[in-house]
Amino acid sequence: MSKNKKNNSFKLDKKQIAIGFFALFVLALIFFLSRTIDFANNEGKSSKEINENSYNSSKIMRVDLDELKSIDFDLNTCDVRIQQSSTNPYVEYTNLYKDDYSYEVKTKYKNGNLKLSSDIKGKELYMKNKIQIVRIFLPKNKEIESIKARLGAGDIKISGLVCKNLDFKLESGNISFEDSKISGSVSNNVGSILIKKSELNNSNLSTKIGNIVVSDTKLLSDEKMETENGDIKIKIPESIKEFNINARLNVGNFVLGDISYRNILDGYMTGKNKKKTLNLKTDVGDILFNQKDENSIKEEEFIKTPSPESNSDSDSNSNSNDENTNKNQENN
């Protein structure tokens, strides 16, 4: 009897285990189906809400300008284009509407000074199918004295600009310059700064999260490029040996021409006897200056941290270090 009881109890335990697994499976299936149905309902509600709360009509506006000396714009969310005009300068922008709500651009113009700002009536709606665009057409072959720009979110694309006093601040988006001659400050919180076929003269480029890419561009004076999280990539016709280079990075690769350097946490400096200085800094990212084909990078130089005793000799050794650097880079 005792053996039969033991066998029956064992069989009962197996049945209980099977029933338990089946119950768990059913509960999991019910939970999954309920989540799926709820997700579908939420997705439908979200899509419907976006449709009902989006601008659904637009109007293109244009303001002709006699001359253009300075530009000052402070805009929330839009794309900005600045380019040369084949005629007189003018500004063109898109206003967005839905019922009593509007997302407009407010313009002020006096004595060649143009000011643009966002004018929102009612609550700010979604821009699902309608994106506000502001286009500024510059006088051809004429210099703009200054541009002050503040943009919340959007891309800024600029071509054919000549300006010696830039002050750009973008929260989110990309900024690009092409065929331009610029001086001043350009900063971007989230997004990249791209410079192509242009001239930089005493510029300060900075991002928090985003790359700084300079290609086929002349660096005419002291330039500063800094990012917290992103790459600094420079590809220009000028030789590396024409610059005093001060570089610093925490995590990433540092390449000059076909030479890859390591251990530059304490900085890298080529010398002080050149006419132009290039200051480069990134916390996390690569610094690549006139990098050749990756397959041709054949040397790795380890920069040693100078000892306190050698600090007194740093000035006297700077020229010899610079000569060694020039020898390494004479073909770059």
Where are these regions (language model features)?
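Short Gly/aromatic-enriched secondary-structure transition segments
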Residues: 86-96
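A broad, low-specificity signal for short, low-complexity segments enriched in glycine/proline
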Residues: 41-42, 51-54, 69, 75-79, ...
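Right-handed parallel beta-helix
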Residues: 56-70, 79-88, 102-187, 193-199, ...
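Alpha-helical transmembrane segments and their membrane-interface anchoring/capping motifs
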Residues: 2-85, 143-145, 256-258, 290-292, ...
